[in-house]
Amino acid sequence: MCGIAGFCNFHGNFREDPGKYYQILQTMGRVQKHRGPDGDGVYLQRHVGLSHVRLSILDPEGGAQPMVRQCAGQGGLRGAIVFNGEIYNSPALREELLREGAFFETTCDTEVILQGLLLRGLPFLSSLHGIFSFAFWEDATEQLILVRDRLGVKPLFYATLGQTFLFSSEIKGILSFPDFPAEVDREGLCEIFGLGPAKTYGKGVFKNVHEVLPGHVITLRRIMKDDEYRLSGKVNDSIAFEIGGTLRRRT
């Protein structure tokens, strides 16, 4: 079990005040420290920040996250990932990627995902067998994707605050972001008390905090010139409309 968190905003530059945003990332990780007592790390670029707390299982020395790699092929694409979970067919995928020109620095499954996405792109996701949630950032296209396993074993939540997109393994990571309102959703609370495990999938206690549904992908990218967010993938249409509308109104 590990913990991931982060934020993305295409309208600003987090690197203009790195101390502030490094501290925010560290806080988003620290509130989930029970998920990863063996290590922590952060990654900050102009439009994205990633945080990770780690429970070491595979490659304790080399598997630190966030993990950043540059692909030998595809024009040398560079990407970063924060990952929580286990890929059962990681050894087989590693052999396939080695034949395709990938170079591995560790033995952990995190790097298999990262190299696979850099080499094959999003179609690589269909090759993954396991339990997982992760966030992947690709530098050249300035694209962030959130992915959750088919059974929804590993949790992943997201929200927006103004023009900033937030995500975390646990809701407390989102609530730790400065000025994010911790407002109880009456309907969500009633479902928890009344229906328990039978509640509407993705419905939670806090307003404007959503759950990435099992087997779903959320893609966040900037449209050139218009500077808007584009949401795609298997995301609930009403949620996509709500997020997209909020961000457009604030552009």
Model regions and ranges:
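Cysteine-centered catalytic environments shared across enzyme families
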Residues: 1-251
